């Protein structure tokens, strides 16, 4: 999607990106073969005529959806069973020939990049070292506190350890990054210079996180599973790809962030037609102490999530520990007073 201030592309993953950052991602479009499954050199070689036909259709008729092309391979559709025309649209998108003009009910409308971004030409392309610098600084700033091994994952940049170490040292030398130490860690961590005051406040024990919320599995807090484990001691995986009999927590578990700590996870389903939000399972992390404040914090977060799904009624099918589930159910069924207060 591209509307005034943002466009859609592969950044962290599929993301909405500020339009002023288009040049930072143009390098990827010019070398799409380096982007793994998102682009297929083989497809372009074997299906060149079909790809050209899809492109010509859009050039002549304007923005189009995958649904506007009749499936020609005779196969049944499916979530990941893309028809040839959809695959052609995607390789043209990844290579920057097409952009996403808009979305309607989750369907992408593809159009020519020159029609969506007429002011762009590759003479505006920033040098690669400048792109690398800007993405590195943006990564550290977004992460807050970053080990070197966490940085490249944020924007899926591909950089050798030696090259990254060189760039980090250069940014420290010029004062753009601060190098720090964390008790118990042998390696250095990096903080953006603009966060210097926050860093000093944190070191002095003057920062007190207050937010409690339910995270998406794709939230940057937990997206890098290694970082979530190292920083929060939170071992997380999305189990929708795990056979049902091997799942530990549920099909689509959502992490619970509470006052700066990941304290648990829940698997929920919104039954919107009945206005019912079902917590199929909920589990606190080992060592989390149950307290009235914890109960009210989590109840507030669950209530907000349920109401966002237009489900005023919340039910808890299973919780671990069970006593916490009972306390949470009571807090949720008090008319929402505690949850509204927490909000």
Annotated model-derived regions:
Residues 4-343:
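Long, charged, low-complexity, helical-prone intrinsically disordered regions
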